[in-house]
């Protein structure tokens, strides 16, 4: 279901000079003898980003998942990029979340970084789901303009591909604008490097405590592996708490 999305994401990473980085041993791939599903993960070093992770779960008609989070360098205070796509084939159900995940909810910060996502929010009204994601506080690490959809095959085949491409383009444009400002000798950030580091670490801690996918991974790949995956790969800063 999500192979074309994965290819598009990796293509953009390669075009931006991304290089593979080491995934913690034993976490790059896992096969479930119980469900027959498999999970593969990639870690990328991309100019302007300190960490970019990608995960693809393939459990056939039962479940398909694509997840990715990009963490900008600490010298850049712009939002993290968050992608969560889930397809439950037996029920023909799509859950999609695409967001620029803000480090803070300050109005000036939102005005500086979210014009591109605001435009997508207007362009794709079918992905403007107002339903709150139950595991998270929408006012923390999620933007008011996230693209969110609970739909079916029509949304998965028609709305989502165009929205995904436009979303990646908008995020790259925001990132490029920040790099251009930095190259001109002016700081693109209003938050200090220490503040960005602290807030990105807090994001990991917050997300690890609430990640709804942890139970899903546990059901497929067991508790021990899934606990390691949560704290060592998905949200590594949560290990220090």
Curated annotation (Swiss-Prot):
Gene3D superfamilies: 3.40.1500.20
InterPro entries: DiHydbiliverdin_OxRdtase, Ferredoxin-dep_bilin_Rdtase
Annotated region (Disordered), positions in chain: 16-35
Cysteines joined through disulfide linkages: none
Entry's Gene Ontology molecular function annotations: 15,16-dihydrobiliverdin:ferredoxin oxidoreductase activity; cobalt ion binding
Catalytic activity field: 15,16-dihydrobiliverdin + oxidized 2[4Fe-4S]-[ferredoxin] = biliverdin IXalpha + reduced 2[4Fe-4S]-[ferredoxin] + 2 H(+)
EC class (word): oxidoreductase
GO biological process: phytochromobilin biosynthetic process
EC number: 1.3.7.2
Keywords attached to this entry: Oxidoreductase
Function statement: Catalyzes the two-electron reduction of biliverdin IX-alpha at the C15 methine bridge.
Family, per entry: Belongs to the HY2 family.
Protein name per Swiss-Prot or TrEMBL: 15,16-dihydrobiliverdin:ferredoxin oxidoreductase
Organism: Synechococcus sp. (strain WH7803)
